[in-house]
């Protein structure tokens, strides 16, 4: 069974599979409250004045990175994926990702995810913990701790309210 078949099978079983630098991470599917936070944040994504990025977002889709397979809660791209790629695991690297922390998976989202994403070419990583209202904004050489609600301007000239 190849990785794409394993991913599809894991969805049928109600779990998410992610691979980070060779380490397989299994996670339960997100719950209602989690998804409401994701939808609220996604609805706030917009283009900053003077930006040329289309600020296209995708929710909960698999992305094949050079060193792993992740399924960010929100991925932000400057353009739509190509037509051929829209029916399979995406391979284009997002400009930014947003993760909403699920209870019990704090380490995955706060400690494992940000350095992995940055190492794969993602420019901005936002992690929101709804329990504490912490918003962690990580980019190359910088990590900021903010408190929700907050407007964050991304390097790609998009903005998002977390």
Where do the PLM segments sit?
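Gly/Pro/Ser/Thr-rich low-complexity, intrinsically disordered segments predominantly at protein N-termini
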Residues: 1-162
């Amino acid at each position: 069974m190849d990785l794409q078949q394993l991913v599809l099978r894991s969805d049928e079983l109600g779990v998410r599979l992610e691979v980070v630098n060779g380490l397989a991470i299994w996670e339960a599917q997100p719950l209602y409250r989690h998804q409401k936070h994701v939808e609220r944040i996604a609805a706030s994504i917009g283009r900053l004045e003077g930006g040329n990025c289309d600020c296209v977002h995708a929710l909960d889709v698999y992305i094949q990175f050079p060193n792993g397979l992740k399924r960010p809660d929100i991925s932000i791209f400057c353009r739509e994926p190509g037509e051929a790629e829209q029916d399979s695991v995406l391979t284009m690297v997002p400009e930014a990702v947003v993760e909403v922390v699920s209870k019990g998976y704090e380490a995955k989202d706060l400690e494992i995810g940000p350095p992995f994403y940055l190492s794969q070419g993602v420019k901005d990583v936002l992690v929101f913990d709804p329990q504490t209202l912490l918003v962690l904004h990580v980019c190359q050489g910088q990590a900021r701790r903010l408190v929700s609600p907050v407007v964050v301007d991304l390097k790609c000239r998009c903005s998002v309210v977390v």
